Structure formats: C-alpha cells, structure tokens
Amino acid sequence: TRYPARAGNDDLVMMVSEDATREQPFAWTAVVLDGYVWFSLKNPADFPATLFWLSNGGRSAAPWESRHCGRLGIEDVCSHFCDSVDLSRKDLLRNLGVPTTRRFSKDEPVTLRNIQVVAAVPEGFGLVKAIVPSGGNAVMLTDENGLTATAAVDWTAL
C-alpha cells in the first residue's frame, strides 16, 4: 500500500472499543514510532469508538479547504463516523451495540476524560497488542513479540 493515496479524497476507519471490565478498565489506542509510543486511554462508555483519518485533501469545507493533505489522524469519538450530529442522532449503529450519541442534561454535570501519553519503549518494540493497568499509577504495554514497557500514568483519573 501507499500513502497518501488518491488526491482530493479522505478515507476513514471507525474502530469500536470493547466495554470496560474489571481487568481492563479502559480502552486504548496506540501508535509506535522509533523509540517511543503515543497512546490514548479512555472510558469506552464516553468514547465508544476511535476514528482513524487518512486525509488527502478530501474535505473542502472550512477550515480544511482541501489543504489538509498527506495527514493521518486519530480521534476518540461518540459519533456516527465523521457524520453530522443529526445523522448520529438516528442511532444507525444501535443494532451493533455502538452508541453514536449521548444525552446531556443541564442539571447533571458530566466530565469526559481522555489521557494521552508519550513514553519511551525498548529498541525493536513493535505493534502494541495490550495496555493494562500496572497498579494505580502505571500501565504496562505489551507488543506483538511479548516485549513490554511500563509508563507512569494515573489511569484511575478516567
């Protein structure tokens, strides 16, 4: 495969998180680069999906104006892909168990938390296969080959 692909187009993949459990109390997304990893931790009840954008000038509306080219993006969401709130309210993914909107009330305060971390990883660290709690102030990342790295983070803040 090659990227960027077709000029004037954007592609988007929506990945749905599994529900939180006692053993896995958060959902995560990770990207590994040479010597470090960026990862995001979230409550999947608040952000049930993650969008992976492959932007190459396909969004003509402001503020992009088809100038957003050769870019990759990751966005935690509660939405119907990148569609409008009106379309998300139709709850078209309900039969798959994926909420696309959330009700808010002026009388009920809501906090939506997302933790983003950059941490060092050992040489040769590959595709992240798991991020799990390691006590209350750290997480352990495991790659596809069984290599591990620990990152200090108060994941309980989620």
Could you say what each language-model-derived stretch is?
Residues 1-103, 109:
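A contiguous, surface-exposed recognition patch within enzymatic or periplasmic domains that forms
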Residues 31, 114-116, 139-140:
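Generic low-polarity alpha-helical segments
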Residues 58-59, 100-105, 131-132, 139-143:
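Short, surface-exposed, polar/charged, turn-prone segments marking secondary-structure boundaries
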Residues 107-122:
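Short, hydrophobic/aromatic-enriched beta-strand segments in well-ordered soluble domains
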Residues 120-158:
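Terminal connector regions
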